[in-house]
Amino acid sequence: MSETINTASQFPTFEKPTVQFNEKGWGPCELPDTFKDVPYQPFSKNDRLGKICDWTSTSNNDKKYQNKYASTFGTGNQYSYYHEEDETTFHLVDTARVQKPPHQRGRFRNMRNSRSGRGRNARGGINTHGMTTLSGKNVKARDPRRGMGKKFGNRGPPPKMRESSVAVRADWASIEEMDFPRLIKLSLPNIKEGVDIVTCGTLEYYDKTYDRINVKNEKPLQKIDRIVHTVTTTDDPVIRRLSKTIGNVFATDAILATIMCSTRSNYSWDIVIEKVGEKIFMDKRDHTEFDLLTVNETSVEPPTDDDSSCNSPRNLAIEATFINHNFSQQVLKTGDQEAKFKFQESNPFISEDEDIQVASVGYRYKKWELGSDIVLVARCEHDGVLQTPSGEPQFMSIKALNEWDSKLANGVEWRQKLDTQRGAVLANELRNNACKLAKWTVQAVLAGSDQLKLGYVSRINPRDHSRHVILGTQQFKPHEFATQINLSMDNAWGILRCIIDLVMKQKDGKYLIMKDPNKPIIRLYDIPDNTFDSDDSDDGEGDDGEGFQQVYNYANNGNKI
C-alpha cells in the first residue's frame, strides 16, 4: 500500500496515572497539591438539611432535650467566625437579673407548660374533655390545697384556722356585722383632751441609768414580785361611784384601746357590754386572756400552734406579759428611801390594813365629750414618773418589746442591729406587732402620758423562755409616735362612737362584740342576761365551761381556762 494510516492523530493518547504505593500501610502517602491549605471538618450524611437555620422547628424550653438531635460532627473550630473588635458599635448592656417579688414567681408556669405541650388539653398533657365533673366534696378530697395561696402562686402552707375567743351559742342573736373597710373610713374629729375627775395611786420615779444600756452593756431582767391589778369596769369602786353622777359610757383604757385598734387585730377577742337605761358599761370577761399581750399577731408567719412548745401563741403571750410587768417595775427607783409621787387618793383596789407589795401605777379617771350627749368616763394608767430639770413631773407609760427567736419570727437579730440600726428593728416590730404597739400608743394618749418608754428585752438563749436581758430602751412622745405608725385618733374615736351608737339604739340588756377569728369583721350579738355569770358554771358553761375557748389556740383540743 502506498499510503500509511496514522492513528495517533485521530485518537487521544492514554497517560498512565501516578499510583503511590504505600509500603507501610493503606492509603495515600502524601497530600495532593490541589488539596493543600484546604480546611477539613468531619461530617455525617445523616445531618439534617436545616441544621444551620431551621425556622420550622418548635422551640423547646426544656434544656434536657435541647441537644437531642444535635450532630456529633461539626464541633471543630475550623469554620468558627471571629468578629473583629469594633469600638464604634460598643454598648453597655445591663445583664443584672431583676429579683421578682414572691407573689410573681411562677405565675406563668402553667402557661409555659401549655405551650410546651404539657398543659391541660394539650398534646402530652392532661385531657379534660369528657372528664366527669366531681362533686364539691370530692373536689376538695382530690385537691385539698386548691384555693390556698392564690395570691402567691400556690406557694406556702394553707392558712391556719383560728379558734374564736368565745363559742357562739344558739340563743345568741346577731345584730350587726361591721367589716374593717367600713370601720377604717370612720372619723370623729375635734375630740378634746380628757378632763381628770379622780386621780389615785402612787408612782415611782424612773431610773435614768437604764437609758445607757446597750447590746454590749446589757442588763439581766429581774423578777419583781409585785401585785398588778387588772380590774374590769363594773368591779371598779371608783367607776361605780362616778356612774351615779357623771357620764353615760364607762370603760377602761385597755378596753377602749382594743376597740379603737380593732382594725389592726388578727386574733379573736370579745367585750361584754351592758346597757342599763341610758348608760353603757363595757367589761372584759373574767378568767380570759384579754390582758395577755399578743406576740407577732400581725406577722406574715404567726407563731406555731404546738401547745407543748415554749413558742406557742399562748406561752409567748404569757412570756410577753411577764416581761412587760417586770420591765415596767425594774426601771423604777424602788425602796423605802426613794421619793414617790402620790396622787390625791390612794390605790382603790387595796385597803389600808393590807400589807402587800403593789406595783407602781397611777390611775386617772377621765371624761371625754363625744357629742350627742355622750360622755365617756374611763380609767387610764401611768406606769412611772420622770423628774425634769425644771421640777415638773412627766408621766410615763412603760412597755417592753421582747425577742423570742428571730429565725422563727422572720425578724432581725437584735444583738446585731439594735445599736447600729434601731430603726430597722422598730420597723420590723411594727410589722409583726402592729396591733399591740397601736394599743399601747392609744392607752398612752388617753392617759395623757408625756412619754412612751419602750424597752427591748431578749432571751438569753432562744430555747429558754425563763431568762431574759435588757438590750436597750427608746422613748417617744405618744402623739408623735401615733403619727409615725399611721395611727389616726380621729378614726379611733370614730370606731368607738360607731359601736356606742349601735348599742344605744338597742333595748336594755347584755351584748357582746367579738372579732371574727378568721375574717376582718366585728360582730355585735344580743346575749341573754345570765350569760357568763358564775351561776352557769354548774351547767358546764360560762366562765369555766364551753362558753369560750383559748384566744390564741388554733387546735380544737385546747385546755379550757
From Swiss-Prot:
Record-listed Phosphothreonine modification sites: 128
One GO CC term on file: eukaryotic 48S preinitiation complex
InterPro entries tied to this protein: eIF3d (IPR007783)
Pfam families named in the record: eIF-3_zeta (PF05091)
GO molecular function: mRNA cap binding; translation initiation factor activity
Region feature RNA gate, mapped onto this chain: 289-303
Keyword list, A-Z: Cytoplasm, Initiation factor, Phosphoprotein, Protein biosynthesis, RNA-binding
Domain of life of the organism encoding this protein: Eukaryota
Comp. bias regions, Basic residues: 100-121
Any one of the GO BP annotations: regulation of translational initiation
Region: Disordered, residue numbers: 98-164
Self-association and partners: Component of the eukaryotic translation initiation factor 3 (eIF-3) complex. The eIF-3 complex interacts with pix.
Function: mRNA cap-binding component of the eukaryotic translation initiation factor 3 (eIF-3) complex, which is involved in protein synthesis of a specialized repertoire of mRNAs and, together with other initiation factors, stimulates binding of mRNA and methionyl-tRNAi to the 40S ribosome. The eIF-3 complex specifically targets and initiates translation of a subset of mRNAs involved in cell proliferation. In the eIF-3 complex, eif3d specifically recognizes and binds the 7-methylguanosine cap of a subset of mRNAs.
Entry's family note: Belongs to the eIF-3 subunit D family.
Domain free text: The RNA gate region regulates mRNA cap recognition to prevent promiscuous mRNA-binding before assembly of eif3d into the full eukaryotic translation initiation factor 3 (eIF-3) complex.
UniProt-listed PANTHER family: EUKARYOTIC TRANSLATION INITIATION FACTOR 3 SUBUNIT 7, EUKARYOTIC TRANSLATION INITIATION FACTOR 3 SUBUNIT D
Protein name: Eukaryotic translation initiation factor 3 subunit D-1
Species of origin: Drosophila ananassae (Fruit fly)
Lineage of origin: Eukaryota, Metazoa, Ecdysozoa, Arthropoda, Hexapoda
Primary gene name: eIF3d1
